[in-house]
UniProtKB/Swiss-Prot annotation:
SMART domains linked: Ftsk_gamma
Residue stretches spanning the membrane: 9-29, 48-68, 74-94, 116-136
Binding site for ATP: G552, S553, G554, K555, S556, V557
Protein's UniProt name: DNA translocase FtsK
The entry's keywords: ATP-binding, Cell cycle, Cell division, Cell inner membrane, Cell membrane, Chromosome partition, DNA-binding, Membrane, Nucleotide-binding, Transmembrane, Transmembrane helix
Ranges where the record places region Disordered: 175-218, 236-330
Listed PANTHER family: DNA TRANSLOCASE FTSK, SPORULATION PROTEIN RELATED
GO MF term set: ATP binding; DNA binding; DNA translocase activity
GO biological process: cell division; chromosome segregation
Subcellular location: Cell inner membrane
Similarity annotation: Belongs to the FtsK/SpoIIIE/SftA family.
């Protein structure tokens, strides 16, 4: 690679010197300072490039320098920029040729193109080349350049078009956007038609004026015209006269439905007869014979209304006697038409009643999104829990919710206007990145509002995941979590925090119907979901829980809520707790409650001993369960009274900081935790393990495999989120109890908000419990110093030292890691044993290579 770089540098220097000489020749060619070659090159350059000959070579040198700085000059971006520079030079050559008639290259191209596109086409081509070059070189999207001007131009042309129509068409009225033929529009049209008819009645008709049908070139064929002769009118036909009546009487305007309700109105046959009598006899020239056509049933109501309007003008002529057959036929026609009118009126009324309330169509969403009040996936998880009546303890009173503060709720969910505005901002921002789609559902809760976005079929989900920061900036949100895709759905979940968050109280969850009816004694109150409904889980079905969260994420609040929910469900003889608190302050408030099996453990060494004691208790329980041939703790406790043995209480180990325990004990802490997690479920042993640092060295593969159910509050990085949840998203949580939960057997994550309980409330509950019963610690779990794992063996007769010597003499290997693997102990203890063997003279100090030699045998 080094020779290649040197060759590239030498080539660049040679080209640079050559271009510098040619540039000076173009500038100083006529002075003779650059010799004959310089004079010749200057004339040649000016001949082909005109006035651009003074800048074309420096411009070329600059472009070549940019290519030299690029590692790979054949990428798409570099070729695109090269095309931009080339188009810019060509446009300048064309422009120079058109304006100054300079440069052979521009003149040749101009003379070639002029016969085809003319001068106007040349200027348009130059403008197009300049614009494309500008967009390529400055990386501007065409939308940001043209769209503002296109919108303004479009609006201006629309306004000019409307003004022209108004100027040349007096009856023009701009169309209103919306839905036509509503009941109000029909009423307005009828009122307008009535006014026009009254105006026509007031103006006298010019007798010399001819109707359009009388002019040969204006005659319009009418399908309902019929021949007017002395024959009787045919049934089902309408007679239309081309001559308006010269004598008529104006009657007051009537309601079009009066004929159906008022029996005093003249019948239809009288109106038809009077209309026929007042019409003059037409000539043969004015008649247009047509083939009689039957009236369609759907047109009957319309024609009837028109006949009523025409027949309101009745002349004062005596009535003629009519044939009884004609009267019978006309009565039948009248009855049939009235029935059709009534049926159509009923249909119109039903359509008007069933018509939805239309709102103006917005360009953001074709359909208004559905507001969801309950999540189906959460309901399915909650339905899988056990519910029923819970037996109250006989000699113990469970704490009441009256010990907790009263719930003071305030509605912090977004209103519809704010949700619509967020939807509009969200869709407009997505469309700027060419991501089309629509919002189909929304979930509004106490902390966040979730929008389910259905992208277009051509949109990749990975493109949406990378827009969380851009969307957060657009919506002025603290952080946005994008869940893509949601398993089992064709949508992407976009969770946006509310402007005001609601405090979720523990009392509200404990008083909920879900918690009260849950029959499991290990029910945990996790909080509320994203729509504000309470959410609980059963620790027996988890069966262990791994919790992670940074400082201020609400991890301690969530753990306290779980402990309090266990204390609200269980008396001391049914539940025992082992609390490990390396920080010495988190669990100190629970000191000396009767549910504790040991005092609160703050020393990591004693914590490892307690975990080993729990593992031994697990083995003891399994041996007894095997003796009585039962598989679970529930079956054993049911048979305990008949077998004359004591029932097993549930034993829960709560570890506040796993990182400190792993740092101190290492494998000694990891093995008992993994062993309890693997086998403790059936014997009633469960783990709740919390940590602030979910790194790989803390949450090892062995622990992670055996703790499938996890809760993650806000963490620092995506890597921490993937360690605890196997996916990212926890880094985008809001803190203050906002968490993600992986329920057993469910696909995906559940976002929850942990309930809050103050220290005063916890003290009240603890005092209430301690007032009923005193604590009794189990001596088997209180390990003495002699039974603790040794970190500094200091005597010759120690078994572990003898085992270490035997292994070293057998394998002839003295490394610390070898002892760790063979003795199955932690690295720190193995290093301590090695140092002790060196102090006893069994091993030599490390040599230059870091190895030790065996100095003595048994």
């Amino acid at each position: 690679m080094q020779p290649m770089k040197s060759k590239k540098l030498y080539l660049a220097l040679i080209i640079g010197v050559l271009l510098a000489f040619l540039t000076l020749s173009s500038w100083l060619g006529n002075s003779g300072l650059v010799g004959r070659f310089g004079v010749w090159f200057a004339a040649l350059n000016k001949k082909y490039f005109g006035h651009l000959s003074f800048i074309n070579l420096p411009y070329l040198a600059w472009v070549l320098f940019l290519l030299y700085k690029t590692k790979n000059p054949f990428t798409e971006i570099v070729l695109e920029k090269t095309l931009g520079h080339l188009l810019g030079i060509l446009s300048l050559l064309f422009l120079q040729s058109s304006l100054l008639n300079q440069g052979e290259i521009g003149n040749s191209a101009r003379l070639f193109l002029r016969p085809f596109i003319g001068d106007f086409g040349l200027y348009a081509l130059i403008t197009l080349m300049v614009v494309i070059s500008y967009l390529i070189l400055f990386k501007l999207p065409p939308k940001s350049v043209f769209y503002p001007y296109m919108n303004k131009t479009q609006n201006l042309l629309k306004e000019i078009y409307k003004q022209c129509l108004q100027a040349f068409s007096p009856n023009f009225s701009p169309k209103k956007e919306g839905f036509e033929n509503t009941p109000s529009d029909i009423q307005k049209k009828e009122t307008k038609n009535d006014k026009e008819k009254e105006n026509r009645k007031e103006n006298p008709i010019n007798e010399n004026h001819k109707t359009p049908n009388e002019e040969p070139f204006l005659a319009i064929p009418t399908p309902y015209n019929t021949t007017l002769n002395d024959s009787e009118p045919q049934e089902g036909l309408v007679q239309i006269s081309s001559h308006p009546p010269t004598h008529y009487t104006i009657y007051p305007k009537r309601n079009r439905f009066d004929d159906l309700t008022n029996p005093t109105n003249p019948p239809l046959k009288e109106i038809k007869q009077e209309t026929k009598e007042r019409e003059p006899t037409p000539t043969k020239e004015t008649l247009t014979p047509t083939t009689p056509k039957p009236i369609m049933p759907t047109l009957a109501p319309i024609i009837e209304n028109d006949n009523k309007t025409e027949n309101q003008k009745t002349p004062n002529h005596p009535k003629k006697e009519e044939n009884p057959q004609e009267n019978t036929q006309e009565e039948m026609i009248e009855g049939r038409i009235e029935e059709m009118i009534k049926e159509n009126l009923k249909k119109e009324e039903k359509e008007v009643q069933n018509a939805p309330n239309f709102s103006p169509v917005t360009p953001t969403s074709a359909k208004k999104p559905v507001m969801v009040k309950e999540l189906s996936e959460n309901k399915e998880i909650l339905d899988g829990l056990d519910y029923g009546e819970v037996q109250k303890p006989k000699d113990y009173e469970l704490p009441t919710t009256q010990l907790l503060n009263a719930v003071c709720l305030k509605d912090t969910s977004l209103d519809e206007n704010e949700i619509d505005q967020k939807i509009q901002d969200l869709l407009s921002k997505l469309r700027t990145f060419k991501i089309d789609g629509d919002i189909i559902r929304t979930y509004s809760g106490p902390i966040v509002t979730t929008f389910e976005f259905r992208p277009a079929p051509n949109v990749k989900v990975s493109r949406i995941l990378g827009l969380s920061d851009d969307l957060a900036m657009t919506l002025c949100a603290e952080s946005i979590r994008i869940q893509a895709p949601i398993k089992g759905k064709d949508v992407v979940g976009i969770e946006i925090p509310n402007s005001q968050s609601q405090i979720i109280y523990l009392r509200e969850i404990l008083e909920s119907e879900l918690f009260q009816k849950s029959s499991s004694p290990l029910t945990l109150a996790l909080g509320k979901d994203i729509v504000g409904n309470p959410f609980i889980t059963d620790l027996k079905k988890l069966p262990h829980l791994l919790i992670a969260g940074t400082t201020g994420s609400g991890k301690s609040v969530g753990v306290n809520a779980m402990i309090l929910s266990l204390l609200y469900k269980n008396p001391p003889d049914q539940l025992k707790l082992v609390m490990i608190d390396p920080k010495m302050v988190e669990f100190s408030i629970y000191a000396d409650i009767p549910h504790l099996l040991t005092p609160i453990i703050t020393d990591p060494k004693k914590a490892i001993g307690a975990l080993q004691s729990v593992a031994k208790e697990m083995e003891r329980r399994y041996s007894l369960m095997s003796e009585y041939k039962v598989k679970t703790i529930d079956s054993y406790n049911e048979q305990a009274p008949s077998n004359g043995v004591e029932a097993f209480p549930y034993l829960i180990v709560v570890i506040d900081e796993l990182a400190d325990l792993m740092m101190t004990g290492g494998k000694e802490a990891e093995f008992p935790i993994a062993r309890i997690a693997q086998m403790g479920r059936a014997s009633g042993l469960h783990l709740i393990v919390a940590t602030q640092r979910p790194s790989v060295d803390v949450v090892t593969g062995l622990i992670k495999t055996n703790l499938p159910s996890r809760v993650s509050f806000r963490v620092g990085t995506k890597i921490d989120s993937k360690v605890i949840l196997d996916t990212d998203g926890a880094q985008s949580l809001l803190g203050r109890g906002d968490m993600l939960f992986t329920p057993p057997g469910a696909n995906g994550l559940v976002r929850l908000h942990a309930p809050f309980a103050t220290e005063d409330e916890i003290k009240k509950i603890v005092d209430f419990i301690k007032a009923q019963k005193e604590v009794q610690y189990d001596k088997d779990f209180l390990l003495e110093e002699s039974r603790m794992p040794l970190d500094t063996p200091n005597y010759q007769g120690d078994d572990i030292l003898e085992r270490a010597k035997a292994v070293i003499l057998e394998k002839k290997i003295t490394s610390t890691s070898f002892l760790q693997r063979q003795l199955k102990i932690g690295y720190n203890q193995a290093a301590t044993i090695t140092d002790e063997l060196e102090a006893q003279g069994f091993l030599s100090p490390r040599n230059a290579k870091g190895n030790r030699e065996i100095l003595q045998n048994f």
